[in-house]
Amino acid sequence: MKLYHFEEKKPFYYTQLAPYRYEGDTLRSLPLVIEAQYRALAEIPHSGIAATTDLGNPTCIHPARKREVGERLAFLALANDYGVTGLPAPAPVYKSMERDGNKLVLTFDNLPVRAQNGVDSFVAFGPEGYCRPGGFEIAGEDRVFHPAVANFKYWDNRIEVSSDRVPDPVAVRYAFRNYCPEANVMTTMGQPLVPFRTDDWPLDDIGRIR
């Protein structure tokens, strides 16, 4: 930013890289870049990012759904710089995790602690309408990730994740690959859940999918 003589008081909004195959659908280069993009929010004053988890295309690096990108960037500017209220909050991002038996329960930022009448809560939405949440993986101490079952705890905006193959889970990932069509979690205000991982395992041992 300093290289371009960026004015620190000027708002700066940017877009999450959209899902695409890149070097391969199941490889992890994209979510690692997304991690860096969200870390940058803490380093860039007056910044915001528009999520695109739901807008990717496996064969086109420039996805066609530009309207949603423009709207999400506009929501950031209208809320932060013009004081407009009643707009969708930024996309939910992973905050914390706790264990409950053989399940891991996740909490998120950018959502109210209690959803009022289902507003600002999680939903899973696919081509045919509402469906079960997908795109989650879970691992134990062996660091081997398995497809996971996820359930919404609607009234406190948490997500519960488990797998019969992982009796002692320690880590969860969501949409943590270059292209993950199963990732379908949104808010009722139309914002997609941002890809995340709860682990901080070394990047040269980033896990396998079985």
Where are these regions (language model features)?
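Catalytic-domain carbohydrate-binding cleft regions of carbohydrate-active enzymes
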Residues: 1-210
